[in-house]
Amino acid sequence: MTTTSAKPTSEANPPNKRGADYLSQRPFLSCGEIGTEYGLQRPKESLFHRNFMGMCENARRKTSAVFGGLSMVYEFCAENFERVPAAIDAGARRIELCDNLAVGGTTPSAGVVSATTNYAHEHDARVMCMIRPRGGDFHYNQDELRMMEMDLGLAVSAGVDGLVFGCCKPCAGGWALDELTLGALVMAAGCATEECKREPIDITFHMAFDQLSPEAQLDAIDILADCGITRILTHGGAAGTPIEDNFENLARLIEYAGDRLTILPGGGISTVNRDTVAAALGVSELHGTKIVPLEV
């Protein structure tokens, strides 16, 4: 995808118009350019960044208040609604809602999002909605980005507790974090919550993270934390490898992230090894399709 950096607005104040019309016309912004749009030299001090970080902190406090009695948060990766009730009954307190798990998960339909969110909230569980327009790689063109912005707006208006997305771009020797697309999606999420006048949402950066080199992963943690991302879902190594083989790298990522964001281990975690993984890594959140006991 070829994009150009946004130019600072010539207006004294940022545009007030929000929503689909504004998003369809606004230029792409990297995380570093979000502050520039608001006429500030330091992105960390931008009005949007302060508000968004404050909203994320409030969301974390709310999570602690609601589920503070639980020692672990098991996030069940669901393909549509079918197994959500059973997963919640089995102890899942957070649902990552997807479609098409055969290709790694794509955006579920608006009807599925609404029904799942309503059910989960009635049963003291939270919903993270996947925002991914297709399978394959995580490098999106401008049309796909617009689709993602519209989809996340619909998900926020349906009441989801968080969004799950990720984006990379080709670089010499592999993949790099796509800061322009990331910035646009983070901005769209913030605009959507403001427009709906609702409580803040979490954002998980999904396993696109695992496409990055070990060195690039540390740089990505800095950028993602700076953007207000809540957590990173990662297997810690190549897909298909036993997660136990990735403990060393996962521990490295957890230590580096500190309290800036949560490293959420996933992939190859089940009821058989979840306690071992949690103890080895010292984590309180785990993700998977087999993370809670379900009948086959």
Located regions from the model:
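Active-site-adjacent beta->alpha loops and helix N-cap segments on the catalytic face
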Residues: 82, 102-119, 170-188, 212-218, ...
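Catalytic cores of alpha/beta
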Residues: 82-84, 139-151, 212-226, 253, ...
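Hydrophobic, well-structured mid-protein blocks that either form specific transmembrane helices
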Residues: 156, 160-212
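Glycine-rich phosphate-binding active-site loops on the catalytic face of alpha/beta enzymes
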Residues: 96-105, 158, 164-171, 229-242, ...
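C-terminal alpha-helical cap/extension of soluble enzyme domains
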Residues: 132-136, 239-243, 248-296
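Glycine/small-residue-rich loop that forms an oxyanion/phosphate-binding "nest" at active or ligand-binding sites
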Residues: 125-178
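Hydrophobic faces of well-ordered beta-strands that scaffold small-molecule active sites
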Residues: 74-76, 95-97, 127-131, 163-165, ...
